[in-house]
């Protein structure tokens, strides 16, 4: 396994560099979608794209049981060196790269015996509307377990540790008023 991972490193590094150097903002991730589509097809994966929005899905295996791995594909629109531009400062370039690397590793190991893996490349996470679009597209209808990952720009866990959920949050609808300065979802503790 270690040997194969070492063999994958140049490919994964190249994927990351491309994605990092070509960020696209929410609902404009068409070149990102095209790049991922071509990459996956070259590796022998089947891909489902959508006529009315960016993003894509790839499935491996067959059966009723489905485990999904989701990544966001959009970049932030922010000031970089005095000018506003798309920028992968939130880590979505790394998220996409990790999912693509996972797909290559699972393909090599041929670990699937029953059921299927679904890989979801979701647009517009930063706008908060891409997940709903994937639901409307029925991407999650057959999913039994859905996993995602998010890098943290500020280290809250020691290297090598992981939290089973968002370390600082919860998935619950709240109603109320918040007074203060806003902050990015990946850095809520920096708001006031």
Where do the protein language model's features map onto the residues?
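Acidic/His- and Gly-rich active-site-bordering loop/insert found
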Residues: 2-89, 93-114
């Amino acid at each position: 396994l270690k040997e194969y991972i070492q063999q994958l490193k140049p490919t994964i590094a190249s994927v990351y560099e491309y994605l990092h150097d070509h960020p696209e903002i929410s609902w404009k991730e068409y070149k990102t979608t095209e790049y991922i589509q071509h990459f996956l097809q070259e590796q022998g994966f089947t891909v489902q794209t959508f006529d009315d929005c960016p993003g894509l899905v790839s499935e491996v295996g067959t059966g009723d049981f489905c485990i999904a791995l989701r990544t966001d594909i959009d970049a932030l629109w922010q000031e970089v060196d005095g000018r506003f531009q798309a920028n992968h400062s939130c880590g979505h370039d790394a998220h996409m790269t990790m999912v693509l690397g996972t797909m290559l590793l699972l393909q090599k190991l041929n670990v699937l015996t029953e059921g299927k893996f679904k890989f979801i490349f979701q647009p517009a996470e930063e706008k908060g509307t891409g997940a709903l679009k994937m639901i409307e597209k029925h991407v999650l209808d057959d999913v039994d377990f859905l996993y995602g990952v998010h890098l943290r720009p500020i280290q809250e866990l020691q290297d090598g540790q992981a939290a089973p959920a968002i370390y600082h949050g919860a998935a619950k609808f709240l109603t109320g008023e918040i007074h203060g300065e806003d902050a990015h979802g990946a850095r809520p503790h920096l708001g006031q």
